[in-house]
Amino acid sequence: DLPQRIARAHAWFTPRSTGGAELVVQAIDALLCGLDRTPQLAALVDGESSRSGSWLSGRNIRTSPIQQLPWGISHVQQYLPLLPLAIEQIDLGGAELVISSSHLVAKGVLTAPDQLHLSYVHTPVRYAWDQMHAYLSRSALARSGFGPLIRWQLHALRQWDQLSAQRVDHLLANSR
């Protein structure tokens, strides 16, 4: 049986994020709502629930402290060093099932031992893994002298990415 109390975690809900990951989130949300299991939603930031006409209009979305930072909603990716810590601050207590939809940090949401965590991973954090060198070669910031700092941050992100994957009960990937 499908649990009554379900939470959904995604990296962010912003007007500019309308890719494949967001379409999957919408489809899973519609499926759960259709089964009379409207999930509690959580994200680093939410710029959608207050927008008229948005599929999230009127929904209560739990967010991280990034929501309150300057340009947190519009430029959430600029806070990359803080995102792993920020996703861990979102409290999903009370949910029996947590479904995360991850292309960056959502799978890192903390769950209790009595919660089942299912994570659908769209892609690895490619700019931290297999595309790191290409990413750094295109980054003006990396070429301006911050390269060593950015490399260290991407190294830390890879370590956290591996650790957070170990905390998930079931990991699903949409590719190899």
PLM feature segments, named:
Residues L2-T18, L44-V45:
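Nucleotide-activated donor-dependent transferases that construct or modify glycoconjugates
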Residues S102-H103, V121-T123, S175-R176:
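Helix N-cap/beta->alpha junction signal
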Residues R5, E96-L97, L116, H170:
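Structural motif
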Residues S137-H170:
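Membrane-proximal helix-turn-helix segments that form the acceptor-binding/catalytic region
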